């Protein structure tokens, strides 16, 4: 399927067919949104950021539908490059009268140097999308060197590790990042360059229902999210602080129930 999708994106005659297919898949959802809620509610419930410089309600609704199509295309296309596992942030849309700028961050788990290939693919996609937005479209992918520099990317990364590695669990993941935390934090915060951005804390919440129907929540805070740990001293952290009743190792709903992971990251400059 990935090869077929790539061939369609490389063939200009088939580009519109691909986008039409995505539009048809989301058509029912978009119709429900347009009929049941107003554009202000839509903008608050979307999974992306959108900055518009026109106030036509019909245009706003059309842009939201186009953005919904675009965000799904990005997730699919970023993992079409051979030998890559990509995690992307929530795209940011800046819609002007004559142009649309789409910016997003991505993290490559395989650390392959294929930034040029991704840029070329985004340029081809921009040309196709310009027909749907009826204006110039520019897509700006920005590579991130560290997975913990965006909360959405970090969340998807944790979920991927838990669901694809039988030897991985939350204890191992969090302990590995706790050990790295002293290296992430500057030795002397007051003497650091103000332009340097560093991770100062995280909050990770696992929330869901067990197989017996009981609700459970486990919350893990460290660094600036923990008022009792202002000095970021790793020696004061108990070894079992990340163990909870929700076990994400074996993804058997009947046995273990369902759960969600929510990550918040805090940075200092």
Swiss-Prot record:
GO molecular function, one term: structural constituent of ribosome
Gene Ontology, cellular component aspect: mitochondrion; ribonucleoprotein complex; ribosome
Subcellular location(s) of the protein: Mitochondrion
Major localization listed first in the record, in broad terms: mitochondrion
Keywords noted in UniProt: Mitochondrion, Ribonucleoprotein, Ribosomal protein
GO biological process, one term: translation
Family: Belongs to the universal ribosomal protein uS3 family.
Function: Essential for mitochondrial protein synthesis and required for the maturation of small ribosomal subunits.
Protein name as it appears in the record: Small ribosomal subunit protein uS3m
